[in-house]
């Protein structure tokens, strides 16, 4: 489900096939004409749209799309220089924010493990502002095995951790091909992923704060280690 004209527009630009759409009956958005050429479009007032979408303030357009084919890890890694891998990040809003951060800062793709939220879940898609349909993403059943395989393919694997013995992010010279691994808040990355990593890095913190929200930490890491 894509909500809002920006997200619906990005879905269409990404080649996604709409099933149907619901638009504001009083003020149909400009994108309505494009949707009419592709799928049934229904119109409803704010009360109807709120009932259908369960949003207190519904968007002017909501569209259902066929789910696009998900890429494989191998397909994404083949041409990538910068990848984010997340483990056990089960909040769809965090996944959406991570996607938007990675896309906006020039990274090439996202890998999520089996316990992380779906990048195309309704909330992930909304928070990413539709970039979940633009940034390639893949799912892996075994994050540690994937990390080990990517290391064998020439990627430097950087595990972000609050561990005080890790290398400060400021002191890291960005390598040519890099995977940054992010874990769930409080729990962090699993021992297996940490063991498979080639580098452990930390964001220097102050005032007794040990770590940041995973999406905020991803944004900082993606900026500091962006491709040059």
Regions of interest found by a model, annotated:
Residues 41, 69-70, 75-165:
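RNA substrate-binding interface of SAM-dependent RNA methyltransferases
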Residues 26-27, 46-48, 115-117, 140, ...:
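Short, acidic/turn-prone active-site loops that include or flank metal/cofactor-
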Residues 60-70:
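Short, structured interface segments
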Residues 1-56:
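N-terminal positively charged helical leader segments and presequences
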Residues 158-209:
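Active-site/ligand-binding-proximal alpha/beta "capping" segment
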Residues 63-65, 101-105, 119, 123-132, ...:
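Structured adenosyl-cofactor binding patch, chiefly the S-adenosyl-L-methionine
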């Amino acid at each position: 489900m894509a909500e809002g004209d920006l997200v619906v527009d990005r879905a269409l630009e990404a080649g996604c096939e709409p099933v149907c759409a619901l638009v504001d009956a009083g003020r149909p958005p400009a994108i309505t004409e494009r949707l009419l050429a592709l799928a049934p479009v229904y119109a409803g007032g704010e009360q109807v749209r709120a009932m259908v979408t369960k949003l207190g303030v519904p968007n002017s357009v909501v569209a259902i799309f066929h789910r696009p084919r998900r890429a494989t890890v191998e397909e994404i890694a083949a041409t990538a220089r910068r990848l984010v891998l997340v483990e056990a990040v089960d909040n769809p809003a965090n996944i959406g924010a991570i996607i938007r951060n990675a896309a906006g800062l020039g990274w090439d793709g996202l890998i999520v493990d089996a316990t992380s939220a779906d990048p195309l879940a309704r909330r992930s898609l909304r928070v990413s502002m539709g970039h979940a349909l633009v940034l390639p993403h893949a799912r892996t059943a075994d994050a540690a095995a994937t990390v080990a395989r990517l290391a064998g393919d020439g990627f430097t694997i950087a595990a972000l951790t609050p561990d005080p013995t890790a290398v400060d992010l400021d002191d890291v010279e960005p390598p040519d091909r890099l995977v940054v691994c992010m874990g769930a808040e409080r729990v962090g990355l699993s021992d297996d992923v940490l063991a498979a990593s080639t580098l452990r890095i930390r964001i220097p913190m102050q005032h007794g704060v040990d770590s940041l929200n995973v999406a905020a930490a991803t944004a900082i890491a993606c900026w500091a280690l962006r491709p040059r």
